[in-house]
Every structure is written in structure tokens, then in C-alpha cells.
Amino acid sequence: MKEIRYKNIDRLLNPSQIAFIGGADAEVAINEAKRRGFKGSIWPVNPKRDYIAGYKCYKSVLDLPKGPDAVFLAIPASQIIRTVNELNHVNAGGIVCYSAGFKEIGQRGISLEKQLVKSLKDMVLVGPNCYGVINYLENSALWPFAHGGFCPGFGAAIITQSGMLSSDITMNQRSLPLTHMISLGNQASLKNTDFINYLIDKKEVRAFGLHIESIENISDFEVAAKKAIEAQKPIVVLKTGKSKIGATLTKSHTGSIAGSQKIYNSFFKKLGIITVDTPSEMIETLKFICISGIPKGKECAAFTCSGGGATMVADIGEMLNLKFSKIPKKNIKAISSFLPNIATISNPCLLYTSPSPRD
């Protein structure tokens, strides 16, 4: 990765100033940045309004005090190129382009997206047609909707091609620790591999969760995936566009070609990538890795609150070739002291949540 590109990704994810260009959508994004806890400068840009979200508006990008580290762009597609040229003039760092109307709409949009990429020069861009980025470690957000998520100082970096999926994951109530949420959209400039390469050395990032509709550059992805494995930071992939209808929707959604699922499965397996089928599976798998670390073998212990649950765990565990080790005799007495008399000490272990019957 070119040094200037790396530097501008860093500016985008760790900004001291954010320019919000647009109207109502920019106002929502400003409020979300404030709610996230962003402590830097907030600069709204709108030629028709005096204030947005309580902040005085600049009439033009050229009126800004300096080149902002990060920019949230929510204006009509027809105005994007001119605005990006102005951002180049003031030496901005990185852009989140929330605006749609590019590759995903067909040939006219493809042409406009090519112009957009050419106009960036050394700046970096997430999108277009994306939600943006959230840095939970540094409390910065360029995000156009209400969001959730928490960070205990470590967690997973989620990188998706779907805006709504990324938003849904931030709202999960499954205690998944997050470091970053990145919604890529059309990936005109920055790809998922750029963010993997940037985040791979961050000690707080323990795993990567990727939602993938397609992979544009196989060799770049392979290199990034191998780096992640070498760094012992597993990649968990949710691949969509598996069905014929899903592949068609993928093309209309972000302009991507889904490709053969069998080829993707073989490719992921070769790279040691974990694949899942649902967002819930992704969340639970990442949570396990971030909290417990990478499993060293197939031996495990399971605890449930019902006999039916214990049976299901045992059945599924056997299907997955997991080994439920016998509890050593020396430990049975200690475990028994924590459980009611009716409990059966086994693995899976049934933890009764109600007390023993009383006289």
C-alpha cells in the first residue's frame, strides 16, 4: 500500500476534523458523530443553510479552515465530481460517499464512478452508495443512521458491502465487541483488503468479519487473508449472492458479479477462512474468537439450562466432530458444590436454573 494511501486511511478512521457536506442526511450524521463521542472539529458545508445541528455552516469546501481529515458526502451524484475536486484542492484525507447513483444503476453510473475514482488522486474514498465508517476505539463516526455497538478496548472489525446489514450488526444485542464497522458499498476506491491491511497490526483488532458479495481482485484478497492468518486474526466470511436470484440482486445492489459459490467455498477453505451462513452465526463466531481466542483443538465443555438444550448441544457437537471430554473424578465434587442435588454432573453439563423442591 502506498504510504500516502495508508496515511489517508488513517486520517479517515482517526480524524481530528470531519466535514459534513449536504443537508438532512449530513445533519443526522453530525448527530451520530456527537452521540458516538467524537471530540474533534465538526464542519458542516451547505450553501443554503446558516446552521446544521447547531454548527455554523461553511458555504463552500474552499471556505474551510483547512483540509479536513475526513468528509461525509451526502449530495446529489451530479455534484460529486466538482466537490471532490475542491476537496483535493484543500488537501482533504478521506471521504465517505453516502450518495448513490453510480455503478449500481448501470452504464451511466459506471462512467460517473470512473470519473469519481480518477478525481480522487491521493485521497481515499469509501463507497459510493455506502453507509460509512465507525471507529469504536477512538469514538469517531461518519454514519447516516442511528447506530449501536460497544467496545471494551478490543473486538472485531466488521467490513461489509451492505449498508443495512452493517447497521443491523451495530444494533445487535449479543455482546459482540467491536473495534470498527466499515460499510464499503461499491468499493470504487477502498476495498475490504485495504482495511484488512491497515488494521492487521492493530493489537485491539482480534478478528475480521466480512460480508462479501464478490471479490474483485483475488490475488490481493489472498495476500491480505494470509497476513491475517499469520497474525492469528481469523477472518469470518458471510458470502451472499449464492442463489440465482441472490446473484441477480447482488448485481443490482452494488453492481457486483457474485460468481460461483463452489469456487468461493474452495477458495475460502484453502485460505483457512471461516464461512458462515447467517449474520447471527457471524456474530456468535466472532464473539467466541474475540473473547476466548482461537480454539486449539476439538475438546470442549458445554453448559446448558435444560435437558433438551444439553441433548441438542451433544447432537450438534457430534455432527461437528467435537469431543465432549469426561469430567475428571477429582473435579466432580467441586462442581457439585455449585449445583443443586438434582443436577447431573456430565459434559454437556445441565445447569438447573431453579432450586431443588422444598418441603
Model-derived features: where do they sit?
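Catalytic-core regions of core metabolic enzymes
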Residues: 1-354, 358
